[in-house]
Amino acid sequence: MNIQALLSEKVSQAMIAAGAPADCEPQVRQSAKVQFGDYQANGMMAVAKKLGMAPRQLAEQVLTHLDLSGIASKVEIAGPGFINIFLEPAFLAEQVQQALASERLGVSQPTRQTIVVDYSAPNVAKEMHVGHLRSTIIGDAAVRTLEFLGHHVIRANHVGDWGTQFGMLIAWLEKQQQENAGDMALADLEGFYRDAKKHYDEDEAFAERARNYVVKLQSGDTYFREMWRKLVDITMTQNQITYDRLNVTLTRDDVMGESLYNPMLPGIVADLKAKGLAVESEGATVVFLDEFKNKEGDPMGVIIQKKDGGYLYTTTDIACAKYRYETLHADRVLYYIDSRQHQHLMQAWTIVRKAGYVPDSVPLEHHMFGMMLGKDGKPFKTRAGGTVKLADLLDEALERARRLVAEKNPDMPADELEKLANAVGIGAVKYADLSKNRTTDYIFDWDNMLAFEGNTAPYMQYAYTRVLSVFRKADIDEQALASAPVIISEDREAQLAARLLQFEETLTVVAREGTPHVMCAYLYDVAGLFSGFYEHCPILSAENDAVRNSRLKLAQLTAKTLKLGLDTLGIETVERM
């Protein structure tokens, strides 16, 4: 149940009846403060201006047409023309019952879309590092949310599996008589990459051989394709270990690397020329875009084919967008790529739209994100100034969580401790990132992320176990509880119920904006409201069975909401801590 949508519809109808245009925006929002009710309609200001009347006057007229019987206990006008809506306790009680009767907690399903989500995208022959963390876990939270809502989601792991570096790597492996790349660990490959690059830069004969190998690889030579495939396989096998550790839903089947689009590139260049969008300029093929200006104020030239016939990332990204619409039949495409790539993507998509490869009705959305910084406010590095490998970061998270859990549970069996430490450690790293607005940079801080206070994974995991402990202490007859009515008579019961019933609204925002921090903030709020409810509204020692059962049902919906919400973020819950 989306109460915000229900109220928006009711207020909109009343506004139209009061003389507002049919496309008026009621602007129904969750109220920021309890004294302003549960929801507030703020749309009177903009509409009253168009109608040439005072907002408060319009609000008064709207109220005469607004029928919220059975939904609101009170509706009042505040300030210059805000409409405050206070929900009826009986309505809240009924909605709590309905949510508990549904595995989906009453969350409705929107019109099903095919949504392609581009995320993670590590490079072949390199180990994943912290720079891949944000794209991987934010993208996965978006995927989980969209799938829960019922959409058909296609995960697209756009790995860097093509380019001149492969000629260089194959040449170096051959030189070392290590053609059987399948037996090598990725750590070896990283060393090979550095050595290969050094030789490529210093030894012209080696560089020439590497360039020849690229040509052979691109022409489809069986031997070179086989060597290339081995490099890709080693990398993806290693990456899958990291994905599994991170509790991320990506698999080998989701790999759609740059190489997938190679066969399309010559045709795209020819088509852009035929459409008059691409022209020859100084030997290269270029698209000049009026939408982007260079320093001189002239249209910016975007190269799609170099003098030597080579293609660029832009060409691949044009092909990629075209493929996602024409072959995957996407209704919407989301890209979780860092903010530094924004102009590059905008240029590629401008060309895509001009060429008619993807219609305007299909959104191409860059869900960009900021950087992960160290405590010094600079990009997060090792003490030696190197790139932090993702596997090393997760090892440290596990070790720190292990110490933390052992300290609080000295008698816990080793296997149980390991399982709990894994949930807490990995959860802490993910939640610390997901709880920040993705568009901003954030400071990576072990102490903060592993704290049991504040908006952290350990606190949220503990909050969940605390709710479960109520049920462990109570001798509950599940059937009797299922048929028991929900009674809302206390303010704290009403506040908790109203917030729990905003789960669907929260999911809708995350699905629309790709902002998992909104879900984190919501769950943290729910945990805090439950804490206040638990302290002020006795559950097991309630005055009678009816109140006890009703409060148990509120606790039950709290537990289910926390678990389901954390699951959409890819954060594991635990039964005990």
Curated annotation (Swiss-Prot):
It holds the Pfam family tRNA-synt_1d. A motif ('HIGH' region) lies at residues 122-132. One of its GO terms (cellular component) is cytoplasm. It is found in: Cytoplasm. Keywords: Aminoacyl-tRNA synthetase, ATP-binding, Cytoplasm, Ligase, Nucleotide-binding, Protein biosynthesis. GO terms for biological process: arginyl-tRNA aminoacylation. GO terms for molecular function: arginine-tRNA ligase activity; ATP binding. InterPro entries: aa-tRNA-synth_I_CS, Arg-tRNA-ligase, Arg-tRNA-synth_N, Arg-tRNA-synth_N_sf, ArgRS_core, DALR_anticod-bd, Rossmann-like_a/b/a_fold, tRNAsynth_Ia_anticodon-bd. Its EC number is 6.1.1.19. Its main location: cytoplasm. It catalyses: tRNA(Arg) + L-arginine + ATP = L-arginyl-tRNA(Arg) + AMP + diphosphate. Belongs to the class-I aminoacyl-tRNA synthetase family. Monomer. This is Arginine--tRNA ligase. It comes from Salmonella schwarzengrund (strain CVM19633).
